[in-house]
Amino acid sequence: MRFCLVVLPIAIALLPVFQNIYIWFLLRFIIGVVATGVWLLSEVWINALAEDQHRGKIIALYSSLISLGLIVGVLISSLIPIETGGGFYVSAGIAVISAIPLWKMDDLPDFDAVEDISFYRYLVTAPGLMGSSWMMGFLYAATAALLPIFALPFVEGDYAQSSRTVAWLASGELTLPLFVGWLADRYDKTRLMIYISCVSVIALAILPVIFDIPVMRFLFLFIIGGSIMSFYSLGLTLLGQEFKGKVLASANASFIFFLSLGEILGPPVVGAAMDLFGNNAFGWFMALIGLIYLIIFIGSNASGKLKIKKI
């Protein structure tokens, strides 16, 4: 953990120093590795230390802070001139400040090595949970990349206005998971996941129809953004509830793997659907993907594959 905390700000600060694209590839790879290390260990520790009766609220707060960090990152890149490289140095400084409370954390769970770590194993054991992570990655990356393109015909080709639609999406990602986390500590989490899936499918399916109405546009983007991040926060909450002990670390690694896989596939797959079937496929295709996930989640829960694993 400490190795990752040291390397991360150094690698970020070195980006503006080198103008060689191959060195940039190397630095970006290093940043991805160490940032994922911090990400994974942080999630495992939070989930291991959180009590079940408060797990939903804690994970929801964590998810909202992730969204806040993404928003702050965008603001940094938009407010600080690219030519000076100042954005990189500010980001490196934020990484250093963030490392301070993590550096001295000593009340942490000690996880033993787990034999037979396999992403496929967790996909078969808990397809609904791994699917929630994949859904978040798929929808998050696809909406972030393609929403401005989808919005262009509705705003008369105004690029600035189409880009601002992402802000409404982000506002939902920031705030709604807090409400979902509060609900998760009071009601059945499995049913809540089903409800969120239904809301996301309906909202995505209706989005192309109502997008030319500004008030409805903002409302639906807010709801969609919140449901996307709720896939992640509620899935992570269920993960901590269902997997205990040393299995939690490897299960969480699989959770992040499927999220990353969804992020890789989302933009090109949805983009290809828009090319083949038109602009409205942006919402309709993602609604179809959400419906498939909903069926898988209900089926895996009915078959008893969502069960506590204590090793």
Summary of predicted features, one role per range:
Residues 245-276:
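A late C-terminal transmembrane helix in Major Facilitator Superfamily
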Residues 92-111, 296-300:
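C-terminal membrane-cytosol helix-exit motif in multi-pass small-molecule transporters
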Residues 37-50, 230-243:
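Intracellular juxtamembrane helix-capping segments at the cytosolic ends
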Residues 1, 81, 176-188, 274-275:
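Helix-to-loop junctions at the C-terminal end of transmembrane segments
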Residues 145-161:
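Short amphipathic helix-loop junctions that connect adjacent transmembrane helices
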Residues 52-62, 159-160, 243-255:
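Loop-to-transmembrane helix entry/capping segments in MFS-fold secondary transporters
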Residues 1-13, 191-206, 287:
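Structural signature of the two symmetry-related core transmembrane helices
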Residues 22-30, 215-223:
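Paired small-residue
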